[in-house]
Curated annotation (Swiss-Prot):
Gene3D superfamilies attached to this UniProt entry: TCL1/MTCP1 (2.40.15.10)
InterPro entries tied to this protein: TCL1_MTCP1 (IPR004832), TCL1_MTCP1_sf (IPR036672)
A Pfam family: TCL1_MTCP1
Gene (UniProt): Tcl1b1
GO molecular function: protein serine/threonine kinase activator activity
Protein species of origin: Mus musculus (Mouse)
Entry protein name: Protein TCL1B1
Signal peptide: none
Family the UniProt entry places it in: Belongs to the TCL1 family.
Length: 116
C-alpha cells in the first residue's frame, strides 16, 4: 500500500496584518516575519521600473521573534488575497505571489510588487 502524500504547507494566508514593522499575523494567528527585501531595476524602452520582492517566513509557535533593525515602514499594513496569486494591499498596491514553499522547517511566501 502506497503511503499518502504529505504536504507540509499550510493554506495560503488570506489576510496578512502588520502587528509590528516587518511582522505580520494571518487569519489563523500564524506569525510571518519579513526575512528579506530585494529591489531591482529594469528598463522597458524609455521606462525604468523598480521591482520590490518581499520574502516572508512563517515562525514556528513559541519561536522567539528575532530583532531586526531594518525599517519596513514602506511595506503595507495589510495584504489581502484577491485571487489565486495576487495580494491587494491597503495602500492600493498589488503584489504577485511568486512562491509558497517549504525550506526545511520554514514555510515561506515570496511577494513581488506589481507596478503599472
Amino acid at each position: 500500500m502506497a503511503a499518502a502524500a504529505f504536504d507540509p504547507l499550510g493554506p495560503l494566508p488570506v489576510y496578512l496584518v502588520s502587528v509590528r514593522l516587518g511582522i505580520y499575523e494571518d487569519e489563523h494567528h500564524r506569525v510571518w516575519i519579513v526575512a528579506n527585501v530585494e529591489t531591482s531595476h529594469s528598463s522597458h524602452g524609455n521606462r525604468r521600473r523598480t521591482h520590490v520582492t518581499v520574502h516572508l517566513w512563517k515562525l514556528i509557535p513559541q519561536q522567539v521573534i528575532p530583532f531586526n533593525p531594518l525599517n519596513y515602514d514602506f511595506l503595507p499594513t495589510t495584504w489581502k488575497l484577491e485571487s489565486r496569486n495576487i495580494y491587494w494591499a491597503t495602500d492600493g498596491t498589488h503584489w504577485r505571489l511568486l512562491d509558497h514553499s517549504q525550506l526545511g522547517d520554514t514555510e515561506q511566501l515570496i511577494l513581488m510588487l506589481v507596478l503599472g
